[in-house]
């Protein structure tokens, strides 16, 4: 199982008063963020296969590199679609609440809308300057699975998510595809490629169709500035460009130190830290 992890070597967990872990078990990837006295210390990501095993793999990637043991972690909160299967968590919190808390922690108190585009779901969240949820809307059935659909499309054209995003961003023309449903759009894209339509036009058209599908969800709840976009698909520059054009608003710039797919895990760690401090 492939994993991606990083440790802040400037911090020493042995000197921390409170060690908190946030675990986000998504449909595509499982993520863990560790805080030391509220400061980011470590993160890891692994592919979600069997949720309870992926959760263990994600946290063990950090434990193995740092010498931390599970019993050293004072508080552990799980979130995401597979949160109930994290056997070592002490509490679960919804991914809606965690996304809002994590976004405000990273981008600051001006954030009012969080758009979370993950592998299996798309969520739009209104929040306060403290990172509390005011309102939210989950994807309708035709916006579901956009992240995974985009991965399938990338496999189809033998590129990764970031590569197809760059191609879409730089394309001068796009093929108009159905934006009603990600499955229909993917089928149309496949047919177009088989019919020798230039790949860059199909790629650009597919990004445009997915962005329109997402923007329909945003319109149902409404958009309040400032906007941040998180989740795995936030790393795709083509989707971001199309969304900003359709919504007629620029998102807050991404933070280079933070993978947008880690924000909900960070939020879970924030809840874990706050929960321990209240004890």
Regions found by a protein language model. Name each.
Residues 1-97, 241-257:
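N-terminal glycine/serine-rich phosphate-binding loop of ATP-dependent small-molecule kinases
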Residues 2-15, 81-118, 123-130, 219, ...:
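Conserved phosphate-binding catalytic cores of ATP/NTP-utilizing and phosphoryl-transfer enzymes
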Residues 3-5, 202-224, 271, 275:
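Phosphate/ATP-binding catalytic cores across multiple sugar-kinase/actin-like superfamilies
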Residues 46-49, 91-100, 115-119, 137-145, ...:
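Active-site nucleophile and cofactor-binding loops and adjacent substrate-binding regions
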Residues 81, 218-219, 223-246, 257-261:
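Glycine-rich phosphate-binding loops at beta-strand->alpha-helix junctions
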Residues 101, 147-152, 256-279:
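Glycine-rich phosphate-binding/hydrolytic loop that grips phosphoryl groups
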Residues 129-173, 270, 274:
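Glycine-rich phosphate-binding loop plus the immediately following alpha-helix
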Residues 185-218, 261:
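Adenine-nucleotide phosphate-binding core of ATP-dependent small-molecule kinases
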